[in-house]
């Protein structure tokens, strides 16, 4: 291409027609997750010439014209058309192309972003050797104490499981972009859960198929998978991968999207679906063990944490029902004021917490579903009208202490995370505005209450650190925590649908498959250690494995390498850190 600049003294209004980005589709499905670039030729929005201010456009300037050889397209991949006065340029796309969701809400910057450098795109293009190198994910820290262990330079991609078909690459506007077709979003994951034993991971979503992935059991099995090569190891497999590359079970039976998953303490699995049924599964059986039919779409389901012969379900007909699995019938049911969106049990199973539309949370006794209490998320009725509770998780303030007060982590669609005391209904913690939390991604507490994990509107995983005794002190003093130490990182360009901090049992199972069982020390410390510099501790930490799923149906497994950079935050800037640098130079 040759660019010619012509000298002129007349005031021509040279404008480059901007590309419009329109979002096609509704909130459900793939409409919000595939952007379409179109050019309006009839009414192009004129924008100022690049490099010229509003004042400078009144003065004479040299208009920019582009001369192009015949049958040659410009660098932008667009066909070039000229107006009659040859003063303005119209870029018309050769075809309408669909792309993955952008990182920023400002989708007009899609053409200028280097999307082809995202993690999953590098894997699809084979730029990461899974056997020779670890791909460490950049982690951004905020408000981190100096002595706090961070994930920076420690978090790496262990495994990617999901659809076998890779996205197609295409050069648009001078950028190489990995292209996802709408048909490739048929396997979007809506729910994911790790079993209580830590051996299984279940994912389900749009295609109505429940996939169960098993932790690799023995070192011999791991070596066999590495020798077989990438053809049998799925999308991305490394020597430190956690799960089998292929699901050990694919449960087929639902006729519509699966909305919720719940594991029992004995590795039984319940799934609720838009086909108005709840089905019971087990990893060793390909067929559903039982089907529980409802009158409306079942939005949520939860196993009893102590006695897995019972479970509760919530549906769009504003009802919650307590079921007996052995009797295959409803023991108790009650009709609520609003539509039920999510439900969870107390750790002891004595009560349940129900999340509803219009920002309402309520507590009921499990035994007979008697009403106990309720509270609203907002004080303003107009704000509650738009608020919907999307996720609940109940936990004890002091882990494994039956006498401790309970707190419930509430996820809503107003981009905030809240933690309430279930007795006083007092707000203990509220996290919002900083990272624009995506309310569709269920926020979760780690099993030792050391972390809260969620996803943001910019497709980042957000991890909040909860210092020791902060929740206890805040609950006693009735104070509200608004800020916590935060770490954020990005693993994909598609919208996240769920994030999980794997329990310590999953890390133990993975360690046993990497090494001999005799190397695993007894008495694992499952709570956050008070001292981070303890060299005799077993190889299990408060956070070892993070799992994220996205709209493309992929499950990304990340591990933390605590052996690399075994120092606390701020080590490089400390006096001892400078001393070590000088010592290494000599």
Swiss-Prot record:
Residues 21-31, 76-107 have a biased composition (Polar residues). Residues 8-20, 35-44 have a biased composition (Basic and acidic residues). GO terms for cellular component: cell division site; cell tip; cytosol; Golgi apparatus; nucleus. Keywords: Cytoplasm, Nucleus, Repeat, WD repeat. It holds the Pfam family WD40. InterPro entries: G-protein_beta_WD-40_rep (IPR020472), WD40/YVTN_repeat-like_dom_sf (IPR015943), WD40_repeat_dom_sf (IPR036322), WD40_rpt (IPR001680), WDR44/Dgr2 (IPR040324). The keyword ATP-binding does not apply. Its main location: cytoplasm. It is found in: Cytoplasm; Nucleus. WD repeats lie at residues 184-223, 253-291, 293-333, 335-374, 387-430, 432-474. Residues 1-115 are annotated as: Disordered. GO terms for biological process: vesicle-mediated transport. SUPFAM superfamilies: WD40 repeat-like (SSF50978). This is Uncharacterized WD repeat-containing protein C18H10.05. It comes from Schizosaccharomyces pombe (strain 972 / ATCC 24843).
């Amino acid at each position: 291409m040759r660019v010619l600049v012509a000298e002129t003294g007349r005031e021509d209004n040279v404008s480059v027609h901007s590309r419009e980005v329109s979002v096609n589709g509704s909130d459900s499905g793939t409409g919000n997750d595939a952007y379409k670039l179109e050019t309006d030729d009839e009414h192009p929005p004129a924008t100022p010439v690049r490099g010229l201010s509003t004042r400078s456009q009144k003065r004479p300037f040299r208009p920019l014209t582009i001369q192009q050889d015949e049958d040659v397209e410009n660098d932008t991949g667009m066909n070039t058309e000229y107006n009659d006065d040859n003063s303005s340029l119209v870029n018309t796309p050769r075809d309408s192309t669909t792309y993955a969701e952008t990182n920023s809400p400002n989708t007009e910057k899609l053409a200028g972003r280097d999307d082809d450098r995202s993690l999953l795109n590098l894997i699809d293009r084979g730029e990461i050797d899974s056997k020779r190198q670890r791909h460490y994910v950049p982690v951004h820290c905020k408000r981190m104490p100096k002595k706090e262990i961070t994930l920076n330079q420690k978090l790496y991609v262990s495994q990617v499981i999901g659809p076998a078909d890779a996205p197609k690459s295409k050069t648009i506007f001078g950028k190489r972009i990995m292209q996802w077709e709408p048909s490739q979003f048929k396997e979007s994951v809506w729910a994911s859960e790790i079993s209580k034993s830590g051996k299984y991971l279940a994912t389900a979503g749009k295609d109505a198929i429940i996939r169960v992935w098993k932790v690799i059991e023995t070192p011999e099995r791991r070596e066999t998978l590495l020798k077989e090569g990438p053809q049998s190891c799925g999308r991305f497999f490394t020597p430190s991968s956690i799960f089998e590359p292929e699901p050990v079970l694919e449960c087929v039976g639902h006729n519509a999207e699966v909305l919720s998953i719940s594991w029992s303490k004995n590795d039984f699995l319940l799934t609720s679906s838009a086909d108005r049924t709840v089905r019971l599964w087990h990893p060793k059986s390909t067929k559903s063990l039982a089907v529980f039919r409802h009158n409306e779409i079942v939005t949520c389901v939860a196993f009893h944490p102590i006695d897995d012969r019972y479970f509760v379900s919530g549906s769009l007909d504003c009802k919650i029902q307590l079921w007996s699995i052995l009797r295959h019938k409803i023991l108790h049911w009650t009709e609520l004021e609003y539509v039920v969106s999510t439900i969870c049990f107390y750790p002891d199973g004595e009560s349940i917490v129900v999340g509803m539309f219009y920002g309402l949370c309520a507590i009921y006794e499990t035994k007979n579903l008697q009403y106990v209490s309720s509270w609203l998320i907002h004080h303003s009725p107009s704000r509650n009208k738009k608020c919907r509770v999307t996720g609940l998780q109940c936990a004890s303030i002091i882990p494994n202490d039956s006498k401790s007060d309970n707190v419930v982590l509430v996820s809503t669609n107003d981009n905030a995370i809240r933690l309430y005391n279930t007795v006083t209904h007092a707000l203990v913690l509220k996290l919002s505005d900083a990272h624009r939390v995506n309310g569709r991604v269920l926020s979760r507490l780690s099993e030792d209450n050391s972390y809260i994990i969620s996803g943001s509107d910019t497709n980042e995983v957000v991890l909040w650190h909860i210092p020791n005794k902060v929740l206890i002190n805040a609950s006693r003093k009735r104070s509200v925590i608004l800020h916590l130490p935060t770490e954020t990182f990005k693993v994909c360009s598609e919208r996240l649908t769920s994030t999980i901090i794997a329990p310590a049992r999953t890390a133990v199972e993975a360690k046993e498959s990497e090494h001999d069982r005799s190397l695993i020390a007894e008495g694992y410390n499952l709570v956050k250690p008070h001292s981070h510099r303890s060299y005799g501790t077993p190889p299990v930490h408060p956070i070892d494995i993070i799992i994220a799923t996205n709209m493309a149906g992929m499950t990304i497994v990340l591990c933390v390498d605590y052996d690399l950079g075994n120092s606390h935050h701020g080590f490089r800037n400390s006096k001892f850190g400078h001393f070590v640098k000088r010592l290494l130079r000599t």
